């Protein structure tokens, strides 16, 4: 029996109403709880929740080349925060984080693979937009991405305030796109903009000293600082928030509700071991303090 299952059983034994478990009936015999079989029967016959439980594995569409979200480690195993979120679902379904089949896909395949049923869910650093929500159903957010400024330990500017003070003398590298100037100037209005063809080259410009800072994803900044604290610094300013969520097929409320519940429990309640480890491993962040009372969600 897994640690999370033991915790669930402990709460059940408490017999304290809704906080102790899901009450199925109150009669002469007192409180009774839904068995796994009864809980299973509550899902609609056509729900993917039933299909996944019957199949005994979860099929997840994701990528394999974008740290810290989804990438292969030195052993060739998929790791990253997206992979962690998938394992959280597997843990909730089967009390085993490893009953997952990962389908590696390009970002362009995320929506088609959901709508055609090739995968049960896509967890692949997917930005939520109103347009995409017409095609797939988004889960509750699990990350708020943004733009941040990466600077070198060897650079002359050590934080965001120093970059601001330097004014026109600051050079900022950024991935080439139509909004590049706008992205940089939103944080540093007077900075010189150096557009480069890849994010890797934008980072390399900081390494070589050609740029004082790189305007890149906040998650990438955190990942690089976590891995190379002697090389990089987070300047301490982030902006342009974008929501990351998982995506499922439209029309299956039971499946969507279950995924949302599993994510919420991992992020805010008693079963956060996997989520907390992901925060530390991939972002260098301390796990959130979970305090009883009104939820911060």
What is the predicted function of each stretch?
Residues 28-55:
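C-terminal segment of N-terminal export signals and the immediately downstream linker at the start
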Residues 43, 92, 154-155, 169-170, ...:
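Extended ligand-binding regions for polar small-molecule ligands
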Residues 87, 91, 99-164:
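Acidic, polar ligand-binding/catalytic clefts
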Residues 100-112, 194-204, 242:
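Short helix-initiation/N-cap motifs at beta->coil->alpha
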Residues 109, 125-135, 185-186, 207-241:
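A ligand-binding cleft/hinge motif common to bilobed small-molecule-binding domains
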């Amino acid at each position: 029996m897994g640690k999370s299952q033991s915790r669930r059983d402990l709460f059940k034994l408490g017999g304290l109403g809704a906080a102790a478990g899901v009450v199925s009936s109150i009669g002469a015999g007192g409180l009774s709880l839904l068995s796994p079989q009864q809980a299973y029967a509550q899902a609609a016959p056509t729900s993917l929740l039933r299909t996944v439980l019957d199949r005994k594995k979860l099929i997840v569409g994701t990528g394999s080349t974008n740290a810290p979200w989804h990438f292969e480690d030195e052993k060739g195993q998929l790791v990253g925060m997206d992979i962690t979120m998938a394992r959280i679902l597997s843990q909730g379904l089967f009390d085993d984080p490893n009953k997952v089949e990962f389908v590696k896909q390009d970002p362009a395949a995320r929506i088609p693979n959901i709508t055609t049923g090739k995968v049960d869910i896509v967890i692949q650093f997917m930005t939520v937009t109103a347009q995409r929500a017409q095609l797939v159903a988004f889960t509750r957010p699990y990350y708020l991405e943004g733009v941040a400024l990466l600077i070198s330990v060897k650079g002359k500017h050590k934080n965001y305030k120093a970059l601001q003070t330097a004014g026109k003398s600051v050079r900022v590298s950024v991935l080439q796109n139509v909004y590049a100037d706008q992205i940089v100037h939103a944080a540093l209005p007077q900075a010189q903009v150096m557009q480069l063809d890849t994010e890797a080259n934008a980072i390399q410009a900081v390494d070589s000293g050609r740029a004082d800072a790189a305007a890149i994803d906040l998650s990438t900044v955190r990942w690089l600082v976590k891995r190379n604290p002697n090389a990089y610094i987070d300047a301490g300013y982030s902006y342009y928030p974008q929501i990351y969520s998982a995506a499922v097929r439209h029309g299956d409320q039971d499946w969507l509700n279950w995924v949302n519940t599993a994510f919420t429990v991992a992020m805010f309640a008693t079963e956060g071991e996997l989520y907390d480890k992901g925060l530390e491993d991939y972002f260098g962040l301390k796990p959130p303090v979970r305090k009883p009372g009104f939820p911060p969600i």
